[in-house]
Amino acid sequence: MAQSTPIFNTLQQLSPFLHRTDNDPRPIVLMTCGIAGSGKSSLSKWITTNHPSFKRLSIDSYVYAHHGLYSVDYPKEKYNDYLDEAELALRDELAQLIRSGDDVVLDFSFAFQTFRNEWKSLVEELGGRWVLVYLDVRADELRRRVRARNQLAVKDGDSAFLVTDEILDRYLAGFERPVGEGEVVLCLDGFAANV
């Protein structure tokens, strides 16, 4: 019998998925999944603040820490190369953290099922337990959040990439929503602006 997908509208409802149990003491790897503006980084930061056993790994933060701001400190043409570099480095860091017994938040978009499956398999091979959290946000709310983020005067790794309406449309059209993948769905309108 298929298990139903948990759908939550508060962060506190997610907390039971963030704890190890006597029956399953493996390190937890929470995988954020969502489109730009859905609140992945806000969720990741909330988790690391409220559940200090978790370490955050973010492709965007890695690129920012190692190369600076998109289109400011390096040319736009280097962006995809730096994303590839970040993914490889974070795979290694994930392996080290799991081997050390740490819990991890992977602050990635995980926009495609094949990519999600690849990382789930990696987590399992390393001895961890994955929790896939899909942040379900309406398209109009995503647009509002992305436009607000684009207007920030101070940029960091989480806000450096300019997401235009056209780019967001491509993201929306190409995103593969997880269905029946063992995901937890989080519906938190207004969350990203409040964390």
Model-derived regions: residue spans:
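The conserved Walker
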Residues: 35-36, 41
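Conserved substrate/cofactor phosphate-moiety recognition/catalytic segment
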Residues: 41-102
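Glycine-rich phosphate-binding loop used to anchor ATP phosphates in small-molecule kinases
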Residues: 81-130
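Hydrophobic anchor at the beta1->P-loop junction of P-loop NTPases
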Residues: 32
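Phosphate-binding P-loop
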Residues: 19-26, 97
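N-terminal pre-Walker A segment at the start of P-loop NTPase domains
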Residues: 1-21
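Conserved phosphate-donor/acceptor-positioning beta-strand/loop module used by diverse small-molecule
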Residues: 126-146
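Conserved GTP-binding G-domain of TRAFAC-class P-loop NTPases and closely related GTPase folds
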Residues: 38, 46, 54, 140-195
